[in-house]
Amino acid sequence: TAGGKEKGNPYHVYLYKVNFNGNNLICLTPEMGSHSINPSSNWDYFVTTYSTTKTAPKSILKDRDGKNLFQLSSSNTDNLKSNGWQEPLEFNVKARDDKTDLFGLMYIPSFYDKNDKYPVLNYIYPGPQSGSVGNYSFMVARRDFQALAELGFIVVAVDAMGTPGRSKSFHDAYYGNMGDNGLPDNIKAIEQLSKKYSGMDLSRVGIWGHSGGGFASTAALLRYPDFYDVAVSSSGNHDNRNYEADWGEKWHGLLEPLGIDSKDNSSEYDVKKTNYDIQANQLFVENLKGKLLIAHGMLDDNVPPSNTMLVVDELIKANKDFDLILFPNKRHGYGDMSNYMMRRKWDYFVKHLKGLEPPKGFSFN
């Protein structure tokens, strides 16, 4: 299977056959969409199930040459739409270099009016092992994107440079600078979309993410304080010197001391003078202007809570106001407290981007 060869969305995956010498590449699943393949044990036959973000899945039995033998199943979105389902808007914009194509999804309120103005929410997961969308097959819902849209926001998720599924150069776009997080592409995408959708209010922009997205959303508020106004950041690996070595070394490179004043050959160095400084959120807290809600599980055995404490410590030292949620006895995900975190996120955006007071005592339980 491979993507990027057929016309349209490069994230759509198709099945091919090819000779051992690399010649005579033939697509066996030309139907537009992302294909999931289930072969027979001898590969004489296979079933492909394919869909797009807007079209529901279909399953077809094919022979090894790609000939359609039988349509096994077909579905549509009629019942979903009759119950108020909103399909996501798939978009294609240019990256920071004004040349590279970027793809993503946008969610707008069911009551969208181009003459009204809506705050923008940017969901981010920078990877680099995956992107904010990644999978462009059909899903009834993606996280709480449409729910947030129904609160009066426009939600944008973009697969920025630095994420997989494209070329190696695309994936390596900011190797050695994990603090980049694809944020220049996210900003560029939102700015371009606002020219097409006049309802997008770029004077009110929020961002959120979890884990790597927590790292990226905090970085957004600290590095681009004139663009992003509010961030909700959970379980972020805010300084990859304090995360798994195989992660930082894979995407940022080996830790190297910089600016050592000592004239001897000592191994001592200043931890604030290394090639990892450019990705460490706690070193940028002086730039905080907007509203920041930061959260972490106290038993997180993926991203140690010390990552968030580094940022908290520097925020306090810099006399900055922020909001903090700590989840006792919770790991990287918050389990039965996840709905609480989602409610707090919704409330935070409603209060600080829409200027409204959230309903008291609301619970998803």
Predicted regions: what is each one?
Residues 102, 119, 204:
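Alpha/beta-hydrolase fold active-site loops
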Residues 128-130, 155:
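Serine-hydrolase catalytic-loop signature spanning alpha/beta hydrolases and amidase-signature enzymes
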Residues 123, 141-151, 157-365:
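Active-site-proximal cap/loop segments of hydrolase catalytic domains
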Residues 1-10, 130, 134:
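Short, conserved, GDST-rich strand-edge loop motifs in beta-rich repeat architectures
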Residues 12-13, 25-116, 140, 146-150, ...:
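Non-catalytic accessory segments flanking enzyme active sites
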